[in-house]
Structures are given as C-alpha cells and as structure tokens.
Swiss-Prot record:
Record protein name field: Phosphate acyltransferase
Organism, as annotated: Staphylococcus epidermidis (strain ATCC 35984 / DSM 28319 / BCRC 17069 / CCUG 31568 / BM 3577 / RP62A)
GO molecular function: phosphate:acyl-[acyl carrier protein] acyltransferase activity
Pfam families: FA_synthesis (PF02504)
SUPFAM superfamilies documented for this protein: Isocitrate/Isopropylmalate dehydrogenase-like
Catalytic activity: a fatty acyl-[ACP] + phosphate = an acyl phosphate + holo-[ACP]
Amino acid sequence: MVKIAVDMMGGDDAPGIVLDAVKKAVEDFKDLEIILFGDESQYNLSHERIEFRHCTEKIEMEDEPVRAIKRKKDSSMVKMAEAVKSGEADGCVSAGNTGALMSAGLFIVGRIKGVARPALVVTLPTTDGKGFVFLDVGANADAKAEHLLQYAQLGNIYAQKIRGIQNPSVSLLNIGTEAAKGNSLTKKAYDLFEKNQSFNFTGNIEAKTLMDGNVDVVVTDGYTGNMVLKNLEGTAKSIGKMLKETIMSSFKNKLAGAVLKKDLDTFAKKMDYSEYGGSVLLGLDGTVVKAHGSSNAKAFYSAIRQAKIAGEENIVQIMKDTVGE
C-alpha cells in the first residue's frame, strides 16, 4: 500500500479538481491511500482509503515562499510536507505556489545527504510520442558542473523507475553537439559526464532537436531549463492560437477543421506535457510532486499516479544509494 499526502487547497481551480482527481485515484488504484489536507467546509468525499485533515490556513499564489512556509504553520501545504518528513506519507502532491512548495521540500522534507542541490524535473513531449525527461527547470538558477553531474544521475534514475526505460540515454543541453562547444560550465560538465560510468552519456544536444525523441534525459542548469520550458509552452500556445484563427477565418477552413478535428485533438494531446504528470523535485528525502497551477482533474490525477509510482519503485532510497553519502 502506498500513502500519498495531498494539498487540497493549492491551484487555480482547487479544491474542485483536486477532489475529483483524488476520488478517481482511489477508485482506480486499490493499493493507494490518500491523506488530504484542507478546509473541511469544502471537503465532500467519503472513502475508506481517504483520510481528511482540517487545516486553518492556505498558502496563496502571491505569498512570498519562505515567509509563507515559516508563518503559515497550519496551512495545507506545510502539513502535507510534514506528513512526508515524518514518514507517514510516501510522497506528496500540490498544485499550489511553486516557490513555497520548493521551500517546503527543502526546509521540511529535507535534502538527501550528499545531494548538493535538488533539481526540478519534468517530462516533455516529443514528436514520436515517447517524451523525454528534462532537468533542472528552475529549482536553481545557478549551477556548477558537479551539480549537473548529480542532475544527470538523478534524471537517469527517474527515467528508469518512473518512465520504465531500462538504459536511458542522457545528453547535455548545449549550443552545439561537438564536445568542445559551449561555455566553461558545459565544457566541464561534459568532461565529468564522459568520465562517469553510472549512466549512458550520449553527448551534447541542441535545443532545436529536443523534441525529436532521440534522447531520454536532457540535463541543464535551472536558469536555462526554465527559459526553454517557458519557450516551449509559449510556442505550443501560439501554434494552437494560429491554427484556431486560420481554421475560423473562412467557411472553407471551418469545414476542413471539422474534418481534421480528431487529428488536431491528437496533436494537442501530444503537445500537452500534463499528460505525463507534474514536475518532481528530485534529491529530497521524500517524493514531492508539483502539479501545474492551472491543472485540470486529469492532470492532477496524473501527478498523483506519478507520486504513487515513485513510492512503489522506492525511488528515494535508490537515489540515496546512488548519490547520497
């Protein structure tokens, strides 16, 4: 049995979508228990494998992260993180304030001893539908080559255990594929990656080929990773908007759009990385999953499933054994 702590109050459409996702999760997974933290006046579920705990406070999206974690001791997010810290829950999921959740992860759940800096990882879509693991996407704006090496090791374990890839290919994001390309950070990281035998390093990868599906794990610093992630999100939205405007521009195009609706829906699904669940803060002494703030019930459900798999695969212990002291 896996037990997941869930923040009922975090996210743009909470608690509605959270309750819907939790209900579906316990119905689909008979070996899953949920501890749900939130406002009891908004709780409307009844299930033997859902334990509800009332919280008097909520961390808002505009709250300053560290201050919110320190001052709002009875918030749903803080109580959720404490359940992981105490070992009562195997992992946790929230769609709330990203900075606050990262602070809760660092200051409450705590780092694995030996991990210099945790990394935020997402699975992004590829043209072949496989997707790839991408980190760091914003946990740390600055990084040393040694940090990138740890990210590669953590990402490799994540791809193996969460995505089921036996021998993941790991690449370093750079401005060219040649070993000598890049700045001092990427050059030093390349040397460290090449010398390390714990993962399958396949060299540099350029941003233009990220979505081709040729690599399973891509590593970069949090500053670059966050910009790439937001660029991909923005590009996908812009393409969707342009397609819609083109289709609606004439009667002929509207007819074509109706004929192609199923294909367009398939394309949209391929581009939606919420299908893969949330982002995960790797390197902590517990599983912390961040669902997108605008998650619908389906995306939040995927994040719960992601946390469940991490618990089943004992991913935290494997990371301790690999990169911990």
